[in-house]
Design a protein with these regions (language model features):
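Non-heme di-metal
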Residues: 1-165
Length: 165
């Protein structure tokens, strides 16, 4: 896949990067705003929350570069759709592979996925969907979702916990 994608126009690859960053920032927001990392091992929880803050902090970098070099709306949307396809495919295949490596059979994998869906906050899932759909607005910019203060608070919380440990 890398070899094929490397032949695509740079403008499309940059648009895919900006689209993927919108996904990771949206998922980062989802982690920071909800309880997605609750129940994780404490060290893993801190890592996941830290990574979510990192995604939120740089969410507009590729988008700003894309705008600065004049990439238009059609390429931006095509890049987002291709990034969506890649992310969903890799996530599905990767999660199944990791669960199988852990020795889970198909029934256990279905149970694990059902448990994740059960734990989802429906309003937070809808808000996440709205945030992803916003990318299709012509006037969209990632900074329209101002969640950097929330990220800074969560990072400060982790820092306090680490110092107390």
């Amino acid at each position: 896949l890398d070899r094929q994608v490397s032949r695509w126009p740079r403008s499309l690859r940059l648009a895919m990067t900006a689209g993927a960053e919108h996904y990771t920032a949206t998922l980062g927001h989802f982690v920071l705003a909800g309880e997605a990392a609750n129940g994780f091992h404490p060290t893993m929880q801190k890592l996941v929350v830290w990574h979510a803050t990192e995604e939120v902090e740089h969410k507009s970098v590729a988008f700003d570069v894309m705008q600065a070099v004049g990439i238009g709306y059609p390429t931006r949307i095509l890049g987002f759709l291709l990034a969506s396809l890649v992310l969903v495919s890799f996530t599905a295949v990767g999660s199944r592979m990791l669960m199988r490596q852990d020795g889970l059979d198909r029934s256990q994998i279905r149970t694990a996925r059902a448990e994740l869906r059960r734990r989802d906050d429906p309003e937070l899932v809808r808000a996440t969907g709205r945030q992803l759909k916003a990318y299709f607005r012509r006037d969209f910019h990632p900074d329209q979702f101002d969640d950097r203060e929330m990220a800074a608070r969560r990072l400060a919380q982790i820092d306090l916990e680490m110092r107390a440990a």
